[in-house]
């Protein structure tokens, strides 16, 4: 008699939950590819818009296709007045990820995906609208300013920085943001992406799938590591102080965010890319203290625990050097990862079976209901 082999692993670690053509993570311990392209190659030689097109279509665009795609995205940047009115009602103290979740859901009420033939339109609409959703709420709730949600910036990264700061970004800042969006765009079956695929497997609409993914990313065990890293780094006065205080954190068994990874075993290939940009921005700003402290943290964690930095750690100093408020770090992740989420929704729909796993019951043995007086 054959016995069914049961896979083990908390949180489904090490278990395959499906097939994808979109991304490989952790092959040989540290690899990352989007549709066959290495992440370092994409970060060096492409733009975020090209990567979004790649994930949605399976191939990089030629010049004509890219120009058409960017023009389509450009035309979708503004927000409906009804959505602006809702964003103005959201208090300053609200978690920014709740703002992104509400903005996504409400936009789906105003501009629904009526059938799956509109999936690319819905995905591109969210891609274009997310920077404005984030910045319109932030500028109004924190500064009382109703911003223009459009800009003449050519890239989505530049557009975001323009909305946030009220002026055109430098060429270097625009490129750094572009690279950051590329690095965060897709990462296989992480928790939020799998949430989107589960939702898609029920044949739900794009806005519902993305709203669910945002809610999942809101959890501190998935999103927010770059924010937590920034909060920690800001408490250190020097590299030596960082190492001393981190030793105390380890002794107290406190969790230190921004290190290690669930899939990568040797290194996170995104780290070396964003770390180099952090160093460039430090030199540009004429203040390398934040970068030097970050390097000290990296050295300490490797020497002490053999834990490497993941993509989030040096993103903290990178965003800080560009003047981005810490509370917006994870919403930026949403602006980027939307491409991966939407691509996975589209892929799930192409060969769909509802995702419905089983569970191993570990509860009480069968029993009878006793009269209430005898319980």
State where each predicted segment sits.
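Non-transmembrane, aqueous-exposed alpha-helical and coiled segments at domain scale
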Residues: 1-375
């Amino acid at each position: 008699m054959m016995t069914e082999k049961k896979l083990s692993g908390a949180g489904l670690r090490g278990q395959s939950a499906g097939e994808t053509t979109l991304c490989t993570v952790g092959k040989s311990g540290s690899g990352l590819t989007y549709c066959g392209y290495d992440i370092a190659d994409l970060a060096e030689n492409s733009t975020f818009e090209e990567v979004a097109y790649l994930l949605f279509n399976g191939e990089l665009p030629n010049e004509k296709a890219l120009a058409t795609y960017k023009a389509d995205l450009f035309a979708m940047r503004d927000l409906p007045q009804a959505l602006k009115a809702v964003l103005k009602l959201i208090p300053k103290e609200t978690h920014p990820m709740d703002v992104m979740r509400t903005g996504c859901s409400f936009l789906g009420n105003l501009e629904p995906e009526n059938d799956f033939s509109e999936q690319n339109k819905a995905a591109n609409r969210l891609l274009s609208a997310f920077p404005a959703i984030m910045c319109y709420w932030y500028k109004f709730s924190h500064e009382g300013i109703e911003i223009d949600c459009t800009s003449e910036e050519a890239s989505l990264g530049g557009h975001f920085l323009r909305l946030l700061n009220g002026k055109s970004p430098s060429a270097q800042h625009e490129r750094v943001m572009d690279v950051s969006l590329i690095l965060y765009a897709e990462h296989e079956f992480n928790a939020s992406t799998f949430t989107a695929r589960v939702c898609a497997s029920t044949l739900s609409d794009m806005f519902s799938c993305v709203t669910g993914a945002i809610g999942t990313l809101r959890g501190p065990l998935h999103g927010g590591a770059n924010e937590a890293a920034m909060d920690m780094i800001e408490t250190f006065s020097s590299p030596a102080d960082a190492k001393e205080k981190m030793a105390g954190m380890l002794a107290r068994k406190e969790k230190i965010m921004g290190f290690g990874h669930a899939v990568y075993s040797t290194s996170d290939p995104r780290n070396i890319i964003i770390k180099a940009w952090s160093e460039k921005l430090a030199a540009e700003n004429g203040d390398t203290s934040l970068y030097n402290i970050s390097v000290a943290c990296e050295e300490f964690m490797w020497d002490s625990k053999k834990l490497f930095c993941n993509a989030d750690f040096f993103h903290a100093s990178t965003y800080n050097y560009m003047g981005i408020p810490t509370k917006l770090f994870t919403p930026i992740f949403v602006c980027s990862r939307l491409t991966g989420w939407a691509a996975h929704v589209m892929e799930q729909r192409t060969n769909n079976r509802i995702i419905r796993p089983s569970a191993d019951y570990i509860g009480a043995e069968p029993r009878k209901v006793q009269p209430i007086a005898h319980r």
